[in-house]
Design a protein with these regions (language model features):
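A short, amphipathic edge element
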Residues: 83-87
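Long, contiguous binding/interaction regions
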Residues: 73
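Short S/T/G/P-rich N-terminal loop/turn motif that feeds into the first structured element of a domain
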Residues: 1-51, 58-68, 89-93
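A generic structural signal for short, non-catalytic loop/turn and secondary-structure boundary residues
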Residues: 35, 81-82
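Short, flexible helix/strand-to-coil boundary loops that buttress conserved ligand/catalytic motifs
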Residues: 67, 76-79
Length: 93
């Protein structure tokens, strides 16, 4: 199993609460639609970043497939213009 954690900072003029709700609404439903994606949640962060994405995958291969999956790429079009900074880390369990 692989854990995938991403911290994001949104652009300054973005409504943070609305953005987090939007991002969650397009990414969280991907669980069950993309093979190997076991869990995904979005939450507001409080450590200098605006929100955190936490997800679990069956394997490294599943994480790699998710990153280029058409449903994931389409979902990103709804919010990528809101992002300023992204920091990610993955680790095996």
């Amino acid at each position: 199993m692989v854990k995938h954690i991403v911290l994001y900072r949104l652009k300054e003029n973005v409504d943070k609460e609305a953005a987090v709700k939007l991002i969650a609404s397009v990414l969280e439903p991907l669980v069950g639609q993309i093979p190997g994606l076991l869990h995904l949640e979005i939450r507001r962060a409080y450590n200098g970043m605006d929100y955190a994405l936490y997800s679990e995958f069956e394997s490294r291969e599943a994480l790699s497939a998710y990153s280029v999956h058409p449903l994931h790429l389409e979902a990103k079009t709804h919010f990528s213009h809101l992002l300023e900074t992204r920091v990610a880390s993955d680790y095996d369990l």
